[in-house]
Amino acid sequence: NVPMQQILEAERLGYDSVWTSEAYGSDAVSVASWILARTTHIRVGTAIMQMPARTPTCAAMTAMTLHALSGGRFILGLGPSGPQVVEGWHGVAYGRPLTRTREYISIIRKILARKEPVTHDGYHYQMPYRGKDATGLGKPLKSILHGDPALPIYTASISSKGIECAAEVADGVFPVWMNPERFDLFEESLER
């Protein structure tokens, strides 16, 4: 259940944001959409949308649409999830989570910028797709929706390398399982 009365009270009290999540049941986007439709000024973010569950273009289209419909109140929170959920629930290879994060956010930023048709040649993603069973008909495309390049993108991390990755490509980070009393474990990564 979505605790809408508590969310509305948080909005009335001036809270800045509320966040939705997903694992292997309810998805974060539907809940975020519901909250955005029932509120007027609190920002709503996903903490997190699992990257292996969606293509970067699908995540970008979703984020652009929610950001536009909400008057700029949507925050895109992404994460690589974990191998148990990625391979067990989504049925795709876990691969290289930091590489996926860099590629995924790079593609989304290209889509939001709309400077040119999007191309990407990476470990996890090829745009246009040229791999096995490709028809050869795919061509680089540019979003027909004008997204906001300033749309905030956050990413989750469970390691110091993940914090470094977030600092490179994201606007914020969710330091999952970070013990505030052991901030020193991440301090060097944050300073880079």
Name what the model sees in each region:
Residues 1-192:
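Active-site-adjacent structural elements that line small-molecule/cofactor binding pockets in enzymes
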